[in-house]
């Protein structure tokens, strides 16, 4: 996907125009323009030069940008400063203009004697002040008329036409009044003085500038999360070059470089510890505040903070391949895409401005035909032009997506695209892979059952001595228990691993063995006791590791992949949301049922082979929108097949690449949080679109004078004020998403 900066856009009509122009370029398969960030995402084989040329022909500017530049492009500080200057300067001259145009009606002190009865001087002063304000805000006229010439009128065109119409008619009225005064027709002079709309033209420009400034400030807030991620990126690294430690820009670090990180420093790139021990704060990536101990062979990530010892690391992933860069790209790409619901606004935006101009012209003609004065008719037409707001339509969706995406990023929930944000809230079924998702993904000792006259320590001593030599996954659970209890083990002679059965060896000349029921029962005389405890452990959904010494049963160790602490809570939250929760596992039905009951799922599908998960998901999708949650390589096909694939962040890169949503904290409760966030974001988009459509549906007829019979009319100045605030309201409403309760905490306290 190629990214471009777009210059000159002021409203949704602009973005629609650019999108339409670029979509016609040969080789472009898809194009999405984001009005919020003034950026464009293009997929296809088209050359940069052809794309930039198409944008230029549409009346705008374009330049190619790199991923690392994206957040910098979201900065709004630079446009706000000149807007603020324009607004303050315009406001000063506007107040002076209002003083002359409304004199004693507005101010308590009189006009200078020069203007006493001098209507021409009064009119010329208003004209001059209006010209000054128009020059200050010339951007609207340059952009508006340039777009009109290119056949792509935008919001600036509406403002420019409205201000020009008000100024033009007022200038005509001033000329007519001057002519009447020279002729001595004072009645006509008074009439034309009432037709001055200089203050309307000035007020339109000043209020629209204020609205744009507030909008830009609010839009800047929506990109705070993305900018915050960028700011995490370290700027330099201490690498070993030619045997010496040198400080270089992080961009110069290459894969394989050896770098040193001291306490308090950020880790510059993803790597692996080769020397030293430390505790690393990974909260910037995972959200977990507890530091993680690091020792040789442990991996470290860019932008995490080394808190204690000095560590020497080897660079594994640099530049755009680091975890931080991938997160930034994911957040940025998600904000650059559009959900399906945005298509409605896009279609309307494409014809909005020409339609408004046509309505304004028709409004003027109709009022003139009815017999109203030219001033009244033109005022109604100007009101139509300046109250109409395509920006509110254009911003309704992208601001909500940006804020919702940022809210997710701050909580370790990453959506890969806008469609994922939109669809996650519509889920009816959530399928959870058992291993590593519901459970810890590693076996642990859950029970120790020594035989009569045998202590736990004696049993663990023999078990640990045997399992120390084994490479079986279950051996790790026993060895971990041995280390935890600090039990010493003995060397084993004649060790032999029997696949499918168990382990055999000698300790101090005595034959010892460990394994499954079938293997041990064939070599012991205590079959009844052995069977009872084996059945008990198996019925609990655990794996019995049975041990014997000198043909006598000495005890059983129960091993199981236990469920995570938050699994039951996570499943419970999903069920409360009306979602059907399914657990997928390769275990037998008996074991799967026990784990499923402990987790609280609605349905258990057992005996699912790795390559069969995709087929199970396909069947579930027939019953409703389905999400697959997993973390392993064998989950990738199912993650891709599901309506929404959700990867647990601690899983493999393959699973993360295949998913639509990534949970960085590896916390299952974030599945429910992602659904709540999606629902909140979609609700916010609906609110924004409703406001945008409702505002224009009511505002345009009101401005046109459709309710004059009811005594309701709209002065162009109030129309401009409404327009300037409409976009601000949309953006401000989107910012409310930052307060969304995605973890359901408020309900618990009510």
Can you describe what each PLM-predicted range is?
Residues 25-49, 53, 195-196, 227-321, ...:
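Conserved cytosolic catalytic loops of P-type ATPases
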Residues 82-236, 347, 716:
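Transmembrane helix-loop-helix hairpins at the membrane interface
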Residues 1-123, 244-245, 325, 329-337, ...:
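Flexible metal-binding regulatory segments at protein termini and peripheral loops
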Residues 85, 304, 425-471, 501-582, ...:
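ATP-driven catalytic headpiece of P-type ATPases
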Residues 16, 29, 337, 344, ...:
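Conserved ATP-binding TGD loop and adjacent catalytic N/P-domain core of P-type ATPases
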